[in-house]
């Protein structure tokens, strides 16, 4: 059995710099991975079937991104094998930290390894893009500055602090936020250099705070300890700390009713670290 992580990511900032003729928004965002996430385990099947096993209630099997990713890879590669896929879900649904997209990317990379397809990263990222705009981010597995609708990625080296992530018990509708007439859509474009020097904010945050008091309250609570931000369109919010101890000290002061976790920022995703280790073991 092959077991691999599906790590979370944080959007450390999100600027909306314009709107295209097709209705999509032009974005600038900076993201980094976390050493915390879901976990997928893969076993080959000889009958060609894809079977997802999870304890999550209400998950439609055929429309799940993991199953769609696996079937897409089967179809595009002509692979006759199937797989049993076991999902251990740790990340909140609809939290803006990439749970579904990360799961899909781990399915693509994991099955590429399990089935010995030897597809290149570029090919897998291209397949991932047909599943969702964020999937290539996880396929690439490098902290990056993203532009366009998120498809133009420029790898960056960032500090790797510890983060406290709070998951308000609400699922934010991304479509609803991007359709809000009060959303800022003309933030001046920023260069990577300016951004790394300390610029950047989240244009979606004021809209989400207005519509979702749960997110507003979580930000207010975390702001008592460190500057707090929202990732993507929410609902998760985060603050950074110089070490695990300080982050955990604040986490222990949060209400038990507010789910949270502490994780370290990573410029190379834990998925890629695992795959590199596997490749080294094979070649040894």
UniProtKB/Swiss-Prot annotation:
Alphabetical keyword list: ATP-binding, Isoprene biosynthesis, Kinase, Nucleotide-binding, Transferase
UniProt-recorded Gene Ontology molecular function terms: 4-(cytidine 5'-diphospho)-2-C-methyl-D-erythritol kinase activity; ATP binding
* Protein role: Catalyzes the phosphorylation of the position 2 hydroxy group of 4-diphosphocytidyl-2C-methyl-D-erythritol.
For the protein in the UniProt heading, the enzyme class is: transferase
Task: Name the HAMAP family on file.
Answer: IspE
Catalyzed reactions per annotation: 4-CDP-2-C-methyl-D-erythritol + ATP = 4-CDP-2-C-methyl-D-erythritol 2-phosphate + ADP + H(+)
GO BP field:
isopentenyl diphosphate biosynthetic process, methylerythritol 4-phosphate pathway; terpenoid biosynthetic process
EC no. given is 2.7.1.148
Enzyme active site: 9, 134
Name recorded for this polypeptide: 4-diphosphocytidyl-2-C-methyl-D-erythritol kinase
Q: In which pathway does it act?
A: Isoprenoid biosynthesis; isopentenyl diphosphate biosynthesis via DXP pathway; isopentenyl diphosphate from 1-deoxy-D-xylulose 5-phosphate: step 3/6
Indicate whether Transferase appears among the record's keywords.
Answer: yes
The taxonomic lineage of its organism, from the top, reads:
Bacteria, Pseudomonadati, Pseudomonadota, Gammaproteobacteria, Pseudomonadales
